[in-house]
Amino acid sequence: MSNQHILLVSSLLPVGSNISTWWNFGSMLLTCLMLQILTGFFLAIHYTANINLAFSSVIHIMRDVPYGWIMQNLHAISASLFFICVYIHIARGLYYGLYLNKEVWLSGMTLLVFLMATAFFGYVLPWGQMSFWAATVITNLLTAMPYLGTMLTTWLWGGFSINDPTLTRFFALHFILPFVIISLSSIHIMLLHNEGSNNPLGTNSDIDKIPFHPYHSYKDMLMITTMITLLFLILSFSPNLLNDPENFSKANPIVTPQHIKPEWYFLFAYGILRSIPNKLGGTLALLLSVVILTTAPFTHTSHTRSMIFRPLSQILFWTFIATFITITWTASKPVEPPFILISQTTSIFYFSFFIMAPLLGWAENKIMMLNN
């Protein structure tokens, strides 16, 4: 595997000549990760992990620290862009059948779990009203686990409710997990270049490969520049576009917000959780909404790797994307009709994709055999 690094540094890493823009999101994710670690380091210098001082320390960063407002907003906005890139990266993998490279796909899924955990811990740190209540609701789901649930929740909280020890350990976890993500990213990249990246056609690219640099590195730079431009546009004109207004108030355990919800990038999983009126069932569905992605390499039935030549699978895929967006939208709304019904329907559609995709693959094989 070390040979891959030597090839990369010496600009000789062979890559398929026909990979499209959808293959640029990996480098964009690495850029986001570096940006998050840099801005996070400067924020950690001024942040105080204490329930009485956390909210004030964030205000101090925004108002008194030179360029603190840039650091804080860059950290928050690039977290959102990070997840946009992650979801596009995963969707690309599903569409082009890249999950058939099992080691890369499963290491990517592990990365996703750590990324979601890191983002959740980070959301709690400002100790705003929504931070506190989102942490209370989500961590309380652990109590649904039989036998061990209550003990695990008490251990995570560091007491019998969310308090100072909870914030301290969340800050420690939020600081250390990005370094775990760096390690996993290195493994992910090494595993990818061990076999080589696939291409939109889903065919073997061994006969037509070109050096990564300068051909694909310049293409990566274009997309990274586009992403950073978008980041600074949001930062300059609407820095609070993706923030929750409720989080501008200090955490108050006495007053419950009218509608508790996590950050927008977790709303799809939260929508699935909320659509099941049973605590244990909802918690299992929440876990399954992410874990089910690991089944993709084992349920692939089509003789064709990519969906590019499979119109029926394409319809199913875009229905899945529409479902994902709809769940996210309904989860941002209060728990009332018609959002309850829409949420339940889209949750069924979400899981149906992973059942229907292998069946459609099998059906398409039969259709192709009939045509031949």
UniProtKB/Swiss-Prot annotation:
It comes from the Eukaryota. The keyword Membrane applies. GO terms for molecular function: metal ion binding; ubiquinol-cytochrome-c reductase activity. Heme b b562 binds at residues 75, 174. It holds the Pfam family Cytochrom_B_C. It is found in: Mitochondrion inner membrane. One of its GO terms (biological process) is mitochondrial electron transport, ubiquinol to cytochrome c. InterPro entries: Cyt_b/b6_C (IPR005798), Cyt_b/b6_C_sf (IPR036150), Cyt_b/b6_N (IPR005797), Cytb/b6-like_sf (IPR027387), Cytochrome_b (IPR030689), Cytochrome_b_C_euk/bac (IPR048260), Cytochrome_b_N_euk/bac (IPR048259), Di-haem_cyt_TM (IPR016174). A ubiquinone binds at residue 193. Binds 2 heme b groups non-covalently. It is a multi-pass membrane protein. Belongs to the cytochrome b family. Component of the ubiquinol-cytochrome c reductase complex (complex III or cytochrome b-c1 complex) that is part of the mitochondrial respiratory chain. The b-c1 complex mediates electron transfer from ubiquinol to cytochrome c. Contributes to the generation of a proton gradient across the mitochondrial membrane that is then used for ATP synthesis. This is Cytochrome b. The lineage of its organism: Eukaryota, Metazoa, Chordata, Craniata, Vertebrata. The gene is MT-CYB.
